[in-house]
């Protein structure tokens, strides 16, 4: 039985690509806890995947969103203002890197990929937060998704590690800026999980095996694990929490060495 932690709240969910997306898992649990949701999709191709998911859980609002296009962002928030007037939480769930550079050496990263990765994976949080702030009339919660590769070198993660490091720093600065309006900003650092995005990382299966073997709980995380953490951060249970990187990784981040040498 759900407890209705988000009953009466409205939330914008970005980053859904298909039914394997972490954003989708978060949306499902948020809906179960009583939230009214608004989905976005990145392109017409993804619209065909996202619309059926929205219909599945009774999400009545869905919009195209290209975070590299200021007009697209403005159109979205104008629509939200018209339909909802205000809302309570935002999930920033998008990230991007050229999959051809998610292997080999980081030093080979192209300027174009560096720019695009930082823009879509990090700067978009700033832009969406700035727009959301004007519509979070009673305070609110902004949550983004990060990964341990922001802190430590993970083979093949490359430019995404740098983008996630910038994202985590942005969380702290945004939390400081927006706290005066009772808007909290946090990140969930999830362990590796099979998604459309992670499939682009070279040798991802090895990453999964290593994580499960090393983590104290001796398993990989599930989408539901991340969904539960997000609902907590969206809800009033976390009303005193902001600027935090919340780990959902079965304890992997606490380990210094997986075995004695």
From Swiss-Prot:
NAD(+) binds at residues 15, 21-22, 42, 66-67, 94, 164, 193-197. Keywords: Fatty acid biosynthesis, Fatty acid metabolism, Lipid biosynthesis, Lipid metabolism, NAD, Oxidoreductase. Substrate binds at residue 97. InterPro entries: Enoyl-ACP_Rdtase_NADH, NAD(P)-bd_dom_sf, SDR_fam. It comes from Rickettsia prowazekii (strain Madrid E). Pathway: Lipid metabolism; fatty acid biosynthesis. It comes from the Bacteria. The lineage of its organism: Bacteria, Pseudomonadati, Pseudomonadota, Alphaproteobacteria, Rickettsiales. One of its GO terms (biological process) is fatty acid elongation. Catalyzes the reduction of a carbon-carbon double bond in an enoyl moiety that is covalently linked to an acyl carrier protein (ACP). Involved in the elongation cycle of fatty acid which are used in the lipid metabolism. Its EC number is 1.3.1.9. Homotetramer. It catalyses: a 2,3-saturated acyl-[ACP] + NAD(+) = a (2E)-enoyl-[ACP] + NADH + H(+). This is Enoyl-[acyl-carrier-protein] reductase [NADH] FabI. GO terms for molecular function: enoyl-[acyl-carrier-protein] reductase (NADH) activity; identical protein binding. Belongs to the short-chain dehydrogenases/reductases (SDR) family. FabI subfamily.
